[in-house]
């Protein structure tokens, strides 16, 4: 099968030509500010016009809540599309291709499960993306668990500190408000008095204790989330992805915090097989649906 894979993130949109499960070509562009799905669908198709005639289907993975009506942002600070945003319908109308759409972390969870399960005999696992926001996907009893309203896996909006910072979802102390790329960036700006990218912050953290402490706070929040998920779902494995999650040294911080906790709560964490493109590949692999509930 030949799939046009589209990954909609808060910062960028990635496009891939996936042939028989392999990413053949890839490109990306910054997520634009748009008021209607038609405009974005046209822009996406213009970027991948050279692939379009050759693909069989279109797969979308996106941050936010996915429904038959479209995309709805749980945190408008990470995705500012009008709600609901019927991107899938417009891509189908303009291209004539069959289109499927799935939450990005759910899509990545399914992709990672398909890659890891034969080797590790995984039955229950979570995928956590630490990027602009924090998202998650759950595979339970070897099936992708989406829930009745497709809301399952929005673990970035579980609360760690009820007195913590206000999240864009309007709860206080969400994992996303503490650990996300946006949260780290806001903390760095408050600390250093100027805008500093997360890439620069990770470099600075190698010799600056304040920068290192910001990253450590994020890593410990994600580690605590992993511990909570182990206690709730008895997971075999947690896979970490996203621009922050895959940054040098971040995963080691997460695992080190987990390893200090009581053994019964500990869970193995590992980096995404799909690296920075786990969500993009997941967009294509949602068509591999033998246990995609």
Curated annotation (Swiss-Prot):
Functional summary from the UniProt entry: Catalyzes the phosphorylation of N-acetylmannosamine (ManNAc) to ManNAc-6-P.
Pathway where it operates: Amino-sugar metabolism; N-acetylneuraminate degradation; D-fructose 6-phosphate from N-acetylneuraminate: step 2/5
Reaction(s) the record says it catalyses: an N-acyl-D-mannosamine + ATP = an N-acyl-D-mannosamine 6-phosphate + ADP + H(+)
A GO MF label: N-acylmannosamine kinase activity
Subunit structure: Homodimer.
Any one GO biological process: N-acetylneuraminate catabolic process
Record's keyword annotation contains Nucleotide-binding: yes
Species this chain originates from: Vibrio vulnificus (strain YJ016)
One Pfam family recorded for the sequence: ROK
UniProtKB keywords: ATP-binding, Carbohydrate metabolism, Kinase, Metal-binding, Nucleotide-binding, Transferase, Zinc
EC code: 2.7.1.60
Protein name: N-acetylmannosamine kinase
Residues that, per the record, bind ATP: 5-12, 133-140
Family: Belongs to the ROK (NagC/XylR) family. NanK subfamily.
Binding-site residues for Zn(2+), renumbered to this chain: 157, 167, 169, 174
InterPro entries with a match to the protein in the record: ATPase_NBD (IPR043129), ManNAc_kinase_bac (IPR023945), ROK (IPR000600), ROK_cs (IPR049874)
């Amino acid at each position: 099968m030949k799939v046009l894979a589209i990954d909609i993130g808060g910062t960028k949109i990635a496009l891939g030509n996936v042939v028989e499960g392999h990413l053949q070509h890839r490109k990306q562009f910054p997520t634009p500010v748009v008021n209607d799905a038609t405009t974005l669908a046209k822009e996406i198709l213009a970027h991948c016009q050279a692939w379009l005639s050759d693909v069989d289907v279109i797969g979308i993975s996106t941050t936010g809540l996915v429904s038959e009506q479209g995309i709805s942002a749980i945190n408008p600070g990470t995705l500012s599309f009008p709600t609901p945003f019927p991107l899938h319908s417009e891509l189908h109308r303009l291209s004539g291709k069959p289109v499927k759409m799935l939450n990005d972390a759910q899509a990545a969870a399914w992709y990672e499960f398909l890659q890891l399960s034969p080797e590790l005999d995984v039955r229950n696992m979570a995928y956590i993306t630490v990027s602009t926001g924090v998202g998650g996907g759950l595979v339970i009893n070897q099936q992708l668990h989406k829930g009745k309203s497709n809301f399952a896996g929005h673990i970035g909006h579980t609360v760690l500190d009820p007195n913590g910072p206000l999240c864009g979802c309007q709860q206080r102390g969400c994992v996303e408000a503490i650990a996300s790329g946006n949260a780290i960036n806001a903390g760095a700006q408050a600390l250093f008095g100027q805008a500093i990218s997360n890439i620069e912050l990770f470099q600075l953290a190698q010799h600056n204790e304040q920068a290192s402490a910001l990253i450590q706070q994020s890593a410990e929040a994600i580690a605590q989330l992993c511990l909570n998920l182990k206690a709730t779902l008895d997971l075999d494995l947690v896979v970490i992805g996203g621009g922050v999650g895959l940054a040098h040294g971040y995963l080691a911080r997460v695992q080190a915090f987990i390893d200090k906790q009581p053994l019964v709560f500990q869970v193995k964490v590992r980096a995404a097989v799909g690296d920075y493109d786990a969500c993009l590949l997941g967009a294509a692999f949602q068509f591999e649906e033998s246990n995609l509930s």
